[in-house]
């Protein structure tokens, strides 16, 4: 089944929830280093997705890789709650909170909010290399959308629309007909 709240889906408290089909489990156990990234028991990607030189509330700093493009941001429909969960507009965030940050390589003004390090999540010994945030590989929403695609390919438009609209309803997006 779908989790009732998408807002906490990618936070630590949303790990292994009712919607989770498969998550890569991570811990904050120390052991990683740039000479041995494979030694990490934590999610290295979180540190790489973080805001470069961030100083402010909620988020810790990172390396500013894997940033969303304007095209990605524009692909969300008005009212789609997944946009705020998925994308952080760093300029709006800085204006709202007084946070400061540096410009990373290929700066777009946006960050992958799902996987920005949160204050208190990082293991100090492995700064940015050992984050306990699980990677949500397959969620039930993904299964519904895969089933919708398979149904569409076999000519079952009704099932395809039903499954797409289940996911869209949770995101508070308009139904497809």
What positions do the PLM features span?
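Structural register within alpha-helical repeat arrays
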Residues: 140, 147-149
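Structured, solvent-exposed acidic/aromatic patches
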Residues: 1-39, 122-138, 153-163, 173, ...
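Flexible, polar/acidic helix-loop-strand segments at domain edges
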Residues: 71-140
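Short, hydrophobic/aromatic alpha-helical segments in well-folded domains
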Residues: 71, 146-147, 163
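An aromatic- and glycine-enriched ligand-binding surface/loop that stacks and positions planar moieties
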Residues: 1-101
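Active-site oxyanion-binding pockets that recognize sulfate/phosphate
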Residues: 66, 131-134, 148
């Amino acid at each position: 089944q779908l989790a009732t709240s998408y807002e906490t889906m990618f936070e630590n408290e949303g790990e292994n929830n009712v919607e989770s089909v498969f998550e890569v489990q991570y811990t904050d156990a120390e052991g990683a280093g740039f000479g041995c990234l494979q030694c990490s028991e934590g999610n290295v990607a979180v540190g790489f997705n973080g805001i470069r030189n961030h100083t402010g509330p909620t988020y810790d700093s990172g390396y500013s890789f894997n940033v969303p493009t304007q095209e990605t941001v524009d692909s969300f429909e008005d009212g789609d709650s997944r946009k705020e969960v998925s994308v952080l507009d760093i300029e709006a965030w800085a204006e709202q909170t007084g946070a400061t940050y540096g410009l990373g390589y290929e700066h777009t003004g946006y960050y992958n909010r799902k996987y920005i390090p949160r204050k208190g999540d990082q293991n100090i010994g492995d700064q940015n290399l050992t984050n306990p945030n699980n990677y949500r590989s397959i969620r039930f929403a993904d299964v519904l959308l895969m089933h919708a695609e398979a149904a569409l390919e076999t000519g079952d438009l009704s099932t395809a629309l039903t499954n797409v609209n289940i996911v869209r309803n949770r995101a508070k997006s308009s139904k497809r007909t």
